[in-house]
Amino acid sequence: MSTIRKWFKGAPFGVQSHRFDVSAVHPNQKKFSTFTEAPYSRHHSVELSHIGPGTYNSKETCFSKKFLEQKLGAGWARAQEASRLTQLPHFHFQAIKKEREQQANKRGPGSYNIKDFLTELQKKPQSKRGLLSSGETRFRGLIGNYYPGPGNYGEKGNPYTQLEKNSWNRSHSDGLMCRLSSKPPPLSHQGSGLGPGTYTIKSDIETFVEKSTGTRGPYDIFSGERSSPVPYGHYSVQKKKPRELTSFKSFVDELNAPHKKKQGGFSKYPRDPKHPTERIYWTTLSQCPKDVNVAGPGSWLPHETEQKHVNRPPFLLASKRSGLKACQMLLGTWNPVGVGRYLNTTLMEKIDRRQRYRSLFMSEPKRYLHDLNRDKLLQERITPFTKGKCRPTVDYNSDPTP
């Protein structure tokens, strides 16, 4: 079992823990300005407590040869100059940088141009084809039989004319040896049509003299002096342009510009509108107050409450009168007698006890002789089936006839 290396000898009872470990001591019990004030740290107690002469290597300090070579490798002046040059923009983009700085500084009413959505849509790539365009040719020509009829083949409607010409050329052609070469026959000598002394032919010397040549020789590496500034590369210097008269826009031209057409004009909208024009402010009640005449929550009439009969407690007391159930529980009496303990007969006395027979007048059946056809039908239902028939009466109690 590996144990922690100790820097002291003679630990009592073979204990391997450190002697001044105060990490478990409460902070209120630690004394100030002593070792027990700070918790135990291996870095301060073990590693740094034994540093002394001869215990560390001087080659690893900041003045060692290896450290100085690393710091002085490329040169601090050259590194600083290179970092400065990398932050500078290329001279081709310096004009663009100045223009952007002026745009950032020159901000205010009328100093910028806000394009509407129609102008932005025109800048986007568009297609000439519409939504219903399929790209197919509208009229593709004749559909059906593409073969022409008789009399439309060959020269002047005769298809055998070309065949006769080919057979004639084969029979009257050149010999076999003449037809082997693919070169065309030599043309006859034709003149240019110019007379003597009407044109000038330049000699070889005149042609060589008029030939354009450069001023640099074969060993000229640079077309200029060595001390002149470098025209290209990272260390190049921008060439100064010759001073010319520049044309600046006058105040009248800027005022009549198309993006300043509506500036300075009177608006048709009120300066302080009652309701804001932007819909984003319509949700806030303080910025967009509601109209008083418009119906809304709380604009209707409240319901009328009915006045119910309430039996007030006697002698204008604030406490409620105890009910029958409370008297039975507290007093144990089933027939309480006292002020206000009798039955309230006020409601019973006001009941209307008159009897009305309204059902006679609200019945649906009609009176007699209201509808003659219907009354006749009802009379047939109650007519006996023996009406109009005279059957002999038989007395079953008497003797039968012989």
UniProtKB/Swiss-Prot annotation:
Family annotation (InterPro entries): CIMAP2, SHIPPO-rpt
Pfam families noted in UniProt: SHIPPO-rpt
PANTHER family per the UniProt record, alphabetical: LYMPHOCYTE EXPANSION MOLECULE (PTHR34914:SF1)
Name listed for the protein in its UniProt record: Ciliary microtubule-associated protein 2
Native species: Rattus norvegicus (Rat)
